Amino acid sequence: MIAYLEGYIAEFGETSCVVATSSGIGYEVFLTTPTRSTLPNKGEQVRFYICHIVREDIQELFGFETWDERQTFIVLTSISKVGARTALNMLSTFRPNDLRQCVIEEDIFALTRVSGIGKKTAQHIFLELKYKLQIDGNSTTSSSPSIGQSLFYDILTGLQGLGYTKEESSVVIKSVLQHEPDLDVGSALRRCLKQLVKG
């Protein structure tokens, strides 16, 4: 399964782009509206975290700027009545931390802002999100999460994707970011993995 893709933009679609790799293969990648609207020009480099969905009749790639977005997409598509297109619409309307904030504030009505989601569907989705989205106990009621919170969640979802628990990951992440708060996601993730491997 494809989880990461890097290449240059060969073509644009209405809700997607074609990413050509150095091997000469082009992949159509479906994107959230914000990501699609901020793509660079043809021929320029892009990289996405990929959710590769395989069905009987088709394979599709969905691309995200952060690992947190990808993992949230996977959570959303695991909810009954939420397909890949609905999940993509949700992430076009809300960033992952915005969705967590909706859960914290029990703001079911906010979900109806997403195209194709009515009140009953919003209630159903909300109930499942309460148990499936990772909520940090220190989250605030601000609707605009800080860069630090976003970085924390990106690293956390990355470590959980590698099999580490939320509890052990959180301790290591806080330790790493306390000493080096300016790290990017990739560097911080590597630091955390080193600490976890050392035990």
UniProtKB/Swiss-Prot annotation:
CDD domains: UBA_RuvA_C. Transmembrane segments: none annotated. It comes from the Bacteria. One of its GO terms (molecular function) is four-way junction DNA binding. It is found in: Cytoplasm. Residues 66-144 are annotated as: Domain II. Residues 147-199 are annotated as: Domain III. GO terms for cellular component: cytoplasm; Holliday junction helicase complex; Holliday junction resolvase complex. Residues 1-65 are annotated as: Domain I. Coiled coil: none annotated. GO terms for biological process: DNA recombination; DNA repair. Keywords: Cytoplasm, DNA damage, DNA recombination, DNA repair, DNA-binding. Pfam families: HHH_5 (PF14520), RuvA_C (PF07499), RuvA_N (PF01330). The keyword Cytoplasm applies. Residues 144-146 are annotated as: Flexible linker. Belongs to the RuvA family. Homotetramer. Forms an RuvA(8)-RuvB(12)-Holliday junction (HJ) complex. HJ DNA is sandwiched between 2 RuvA tetramers; dsDNA enters through RuvA and exits via RuvB. An RuvB hexamer assembles on each DNA strand where it exits the tetramer. Each RuvB hexamer is contacted by two RuvA subunits (via domain III) on 2 adjacent RuvB subunits; this complex drives branch migration. In the full resolvosome a probable DNA-RuvA(4)-RuvB(12)-RuvC(2) complex forms which resolves the HJ. The RuvA-RuvB-RuvC complex processes Holliday junction (HJ) DNA during genetic recombination and DNA repair, while the RuvA-RuvB complex plays an important role in the rescue of blocked DNA replication forks via replication fork reversal (RFR). RuvA specifically binds to HJ cruciform DNA, conferring on it an open structure. The RuvB hexamer acts as an ATP-dependent pump, pulling dsDNA into and through the RuvAB complex. HJ branch migration allows RuvC to scan DNA until it finds its consensus sequence, where it cleaves and resolves the cruciform DNA. HAMAP family: DNA_HJ_migration_RuvA (MF_00031). Has three domains with a flexible linker between the domains II and III and assumes an 'L' shape. Domain III is highly mobile and contacts RuvB. This is Holliday junction branch migration complex subunit RuvA. It comes from Lawsonia intracellularis (strain PHE/MN1-00). The lineage of its organism: Bacteria, Pseudomonadati, Thermodesulfobacteriota, Desulfovibrionia, Desulfovibrionales.
